[in-house]
């Protein structure tokens, strides 16, 4: 009698576990490894995309754009968000491992903004001044700017040294800024590097003599964004109009890279998410996060890759 009871209890326990086993078996997962700049947007997209779908799970890691190519090539990621294009070396290494080129969809535009403390009286900068602040040599700008007075700042800040903040080498923003603002030259050795853009903005907010760069989506009321000029043009703030028109000097496209199947297309699960990323709803979310939504012509072109 006791043996039958034990067997019955064991059977009941097994039956209670079956729904959990079934749910686990049916669960689908998308893994994203890459850009810190795109981290919060990917989280928001994942939440919106997975609403009402209990079987879909997203895993989003943001070590930086440099991590995306290898994560895709090894199969550790389904999506590789990058705030810059893959380098020729990264693309060649990917093709060597996978036997084909990666897929890539442009998902939004961004601007790398220059941030100063609200009490800093500096009104604007020229691109050549940016090189004077961050570059290790003078081939792109002019003589190094060491104190704020050398950038035209007066008052209590004039004799203060510049505290230069920037991203670390794993960041796509680090590489984009190096090419677009420093003429491809090296960074000064006294640039304080951060793994995340949010930490740069937070440091500027509490340090009157600091200046940093990060994606525009990290702007907040605790810091001030500087207008920026190219050559003799008027300085402009980064916004949707100046980015799309090409007037803001540090504008850039943002990408989601993916693995292609033998037919050149992404997997059905990845393709469905990419179509969502190009949808009006997702583009509206991107705009709310400080990015610039794709124009209709861009959406049409990028969507063509998913047909």
Give residue ranges: language-model regions.
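Bacterial N-terminal signal peptides
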Residues: 9-20
